[in-house]
Structures are given as C-alpha cells and as structure tokens.
Amino acid sequence: MKFWKLLTAASALAVITASAPAFAQTDEKLPEFTTEGFEDWLVAFKKEAAAKGISEPTLEIAFADTKPIPKVIEYDRSQPEFKLTFEQYLQRVVPQSRINEGRAKYAENRSVIDAAAKKYGVPGQYLTAFWGIETGFGRHTGGYSVVDSLATLAFEGRRAEYFRKELMNALTIIDAGHIAAEDMTGSWAGAMGQAQFMPSTFLNYARDGNDDGKIDLWGAKEDVFASAANYLSTVGWKADERWGREITLPKDFDKELEGRDIRKPISEWQKIGVRMPNGGDLPKADMDASIVIVNDGEGPAYMVYNNFHTIMHWNRSTYFAIAVGTLADAIAGY
C-alpha cells in the first residue's frame, strides 16, 4: 500500500530525529553516494567491534553478506514532497477500519496486553494504538536487514557516530542471543520489530514479557507489549491521566498561550474561556495542561496533558501524538 510505505518512511525518519543528534539541513547538494571503500570500512569496524567484546561468530554471521544499500541513503536524504493537513493525516492514520481492527485486536490479545498494562501502568488501549499506528498491528515491521541498513548509514558518514553506535548495539543484541542476525529485520533506518525500537532503545527499555530468557520484538507479543509499556512508563506515563482532548477556544484567545511548553492548571484555562467542544465546562481535575493548535495555528485545538508529552518521547510529531490518543480513545469507546 503506497501510503503505508510513505508513513513507514516518515516514521523511520522520526525515530532517527527523536534519538539522534541534530543534523543541519542545507540547500547544498549532497555528494552522490558511492560504495567505494565500504569493504575497508567494514574490516575496520569489525576490528573495533571485536575489541569491544562482540564475539567472532556473531561478527562472521552478522556480516556474512553485508553490502551497502543505496535505497537506504535515498530514503535518508529524501524530503516529503507534500504536506498533509491534520485532517488528511488523521483520516489516513486513524480511519474507521483501523479503529475497528484495533478493537478486535485488543479483544483478541487482551490477556497479553492487559498483563503489560497492569505491570507498567499504561492502559491497554494505548498499547494497542501504538501497535496499530507503528506497524499495522504487527504486519508491517520492515523488510530491511538492520545490520546492513545501519552499516550503510554509518558508512555514508553524515551521522556516522550515531549509526556506528546503533550498529554496535544491534550486534550486542545478536550476541546476547535475543535474535538471529538473519532474522533481525526492520525499517530502512534500523527500527526493529513490532515496537519499532532502535537498537539503543531495545537495550535500554525492552523487556522479556514471557520469561523465556530472551527478548523477541518480532514474534513474541508478550515482549512487544511489555517493552512498549516499560518505555512509556519509564519516560513519564501517568496511569491515572488521559492524553488530552479536543476543545474550543474563545474568539479573543491569545495565541501566545499556545504551545506544549506553556502549562497551566485546567482551572486557569477555564477562566480564560477554553471550553469543551459542546460549550460545556472543562473537567474539574487537578492537572496541568497545554493548548496545541494544529494546521499551523488554524485549528482544531487540543488541550493536552502529561501523557501527550510522554507520547512525544516516542515520536516528536504532534500529529502522531494526537493520532495515538485519538485511536486509543476510540478503541476504548470514549
């Protein structure tokens, strides 16, 4: 499906930008990518990996047929050709068909999802929503060799330090026996499995949900949901709060008050004139909130809480965070 490929590419880019050092974009034309020198680079990298403790069998198997992938560099250098409006994005990412499937998938996997939800304090509808948006409920995890993709990006050089570390992390995961090198597939950017974790995220946050001694984000749903829930819990999820809600603003609303960095008690927003979409009062809750206005300030407007900011640790896109919350609410029947 063409749009899913577009969304996957965008998601992969978001994974990089969320976890990698900033890389300045310029109008200068980048030099044409060449594979010349890759073999020498790989020999040097393998020596470095061995010196850092990666076993010889892992290095031999992981790099048995490694070649640079020009398509990865093409994706990495590409810029979006068009910009979706918020409404277009939400319709494509949270269509009724995905809501229906989300409800069915949650029901089908309820025992596994709810076990992770209970242990880590992240409600099951959110775990299901992340799963649905990231990988289409596990169907679209990416078909690139993670080792080859990361080696290509590290060799290309623009963010060599970051991708060298991620490649080393990927080898560490293989060396620990979590996944065979040939089965470590993911996005062109190196995001892996049904949770789309980068190798560093895997090492820091992934969990063995089925207690079998290894972490399989590709095939073991217990591990997938435990890992996603642990990540969200660790970076700040509050179990007793929702993510946010759509609201209406007074006509004289000061746009200087808009933005994720401006947080006020809900009661203060009520005094300013912020209301529910039906004109009713805001909920009486002792919570801080921010106002986010999409479509470059044209609306609609959302009141967002702590968990919205937590979602944005996963992906820095405001649209993505609203989509996750919207899908989660729909799955739960809100």
Regions of interest found by a model, annotated:
Residues 49, 58-70, 123-138, 170-175, ...:
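Short, functionally critical alpha-helical segments immediately adjacent to catalytic or ligand/cofactor-binding
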Residues 25-108, 114-117:
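An acidic, Gly/Ser/Thr/Pro-rich helix-cap/linker signature
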Residues 209-217:
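Acidic, glycine-anchored loop motifs typical of Ca2+
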Residues 145-154, 167, 192-207, 228:
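Substrate-binding/active-site groove segments that recognize
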Residues 68-75, 135-144, 156-160, 176-182, ...:
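Secretory-pathway/luminal and periplasmic proteins that interact with or process carbohydrate-rich
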Residues 15-23:
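C-terminal segment of classical bacterial N-terminal signal peptides
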Residues 1-9:
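Bacterial N-terminal signal peptides that target proteins for export
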Residues 247-334:
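C-terminal soluble interaction/assembly domains
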